A protein has these predicted regions:
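Conserved active-site and SAM-binding loop architecture
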Residues: 1-224
Length: 224
């Protein structure tokens, strides 16, 4: 659309932290998170309609942070239960299968919306094993302390984007603070918060649309 600011779609972004620098810079941003909009699997048609209404079915950037509760190595002790039949509501056979579905729907977004850049993040774990489609797109890993937040939580990014983020390393004086969070639903929500320093660095490296971020390989691979 002529004379319109760029358009960003950010999914599984409960706090909006990852998208915040784009919002502050005047981008048009559509956030979707199950806490507010409901399941993206059930509401995918509505999401497509919203993108069509807002930007004629196209997005300039796509950010995705799918739930890590079935993937993160920190929760490996519960994998057996999450993999077991009956651990999720029908039509899913298991909780893990449902989480894989939430991850794989990102491929559909990439093919349908053809973003100029896209990125998917998850902590260290087994997501690549369960979603092998990710492997060709692994681009970088980081800890929050690399970008100004003084704690560690090793996170991996897949996608087609500029990985040359400006670093702002600080001492991780808070250590692995995620392990000290209290148990319960609130713990999962807090663990999923995108570090603000990383979000700013990602924006700085991935906002100038005159740069050709994408290699073009994603459409070829996803269509095969």
């Amino acid at each position: 659309m002529l004379n319109q600011p760029p358009f960003l779609l950010s999914v599984y972004d409960y706090t909006g932290n990852w998208a915040r620098p784009y919002i502050d810079a005047g981008w048009r941003v559509l956030l979707w998170d199950q806490h507010f909009e409901g399941s993206i699997l059930e509401g995918f048609g509505r999401l497509v309609s919203l993108v069509e209404e807002e930007n004629e079915g196209r997005v300039d950037g796509l950010l995705a942070a799918p739930p890590c509760t079935a993937f993160a190595a920190s929760g490996a002790r519960w994998w057996q239960y999450k993999d077991s039949p009956g651990s999720a509501e029908p039509p899913w056979e298991s909780f893990t299968e449902q989480m894989v579905g939430l991850t794989l729907i990102v491929w559909e977004m990439v093919v349908r919306f053809r973003p100029r850049f896209w990125a998917l993040e998850n902590p260290v774990g087994r997501i690549e094993k369960l979603c092998p489609e990710l492997k060709p797109f692994r681009r970088m890993s980081f800890n929050p302390c690399d970008y100004g937040d003084p704690y560690i939580k090793k996170t991996i990014l897949w996608g087609d984007f500029n990985p040359n983020l400006p670093r702002n390393p600080v001492r991780p004086v808070e250590g692995s603070k995620m392990h000290r969070l209290p148990a319960g639903r609130r713990r999962s929500e807090l663990r999923s918060v995108t570090p603000s320093g990383f979000a700013r660095a990602f924006y700085k490296a991935n906002h100038d649309l005159s740069i050709n971020f994408a290699s073009g390989r994603q459409l070829e691979l996803f269509a095969s």
